[in-house]
C-alpha cells in the first residue's frame, strides 16, 4: 500500500464551487481505476474547521505501484497540472490499515457524491490527516506499532491508515469519517466531496509487513 497526496492551495477569495463542479464532473472517472484502493476528493475552506486556506487536496491509498505510476504519468494528472500547475506529490509507504464500522455499508464504488453529503448519505463526509516527525532517537518500528495500536475505534470511522515517509522519517495518520470528525482527533480537517474506492476491499487490514 502506498499513500499519496498533493495540495493545491487557492486564493483566499477563490470560488470553491469551481472545485465542487470539477469533482462532480470528473470524480467518477476513478471509481473503477485499476490498482487504486481509494481516492478521497478533499477540500479545505478558509475559515471553516480551523482552516487558514482554501485548498484542494486529494488523498490516495494505492494498492499497487503500477496503478500509482499509471495515474501520475497519465492523462488525469496531466490535465490537473495543466489547470492548476504541477503540484508537489507527497508519498508515504503504507504501514497499516483499519476498516471502520462506518465503511461496512459501502458499495465498493464511488459512494460519496459531490458537495457536503447529508447525515444519511453513503460514504465518508470528513477526513483528518496528521503528520509527525519521528525524533532521531525514536525506534521507527516501535513508533509505527504504537500508531497502529492507536488507530481510532469509533463508530463513525470509515477507514484509517498509517504510513511513513522514510526520507523525512515522518509518520502519517489519515482517517475518513462519516459525519463530523471527533473533536479529540488531531490534525488538519477536510470535507470529502467524493470517494472512489475500487480496490479498497483488496487492501489487507492490520499491519503491512
Task: Show which residues each predicted segment covers.
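Short S/T/G/P-rich N-terminal loop/turn motif that feeds into the first structured element of a domain
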Residues: 1-33, 37-38, 47-48, 67-71, ...
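Conserved residues at the C-terminal ends of beta-strands
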Residues: 42
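Hydrophobic/aromatic-rich structural module bridging two neighboring secondary-structure elements via a short loop
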Residues: 45-90
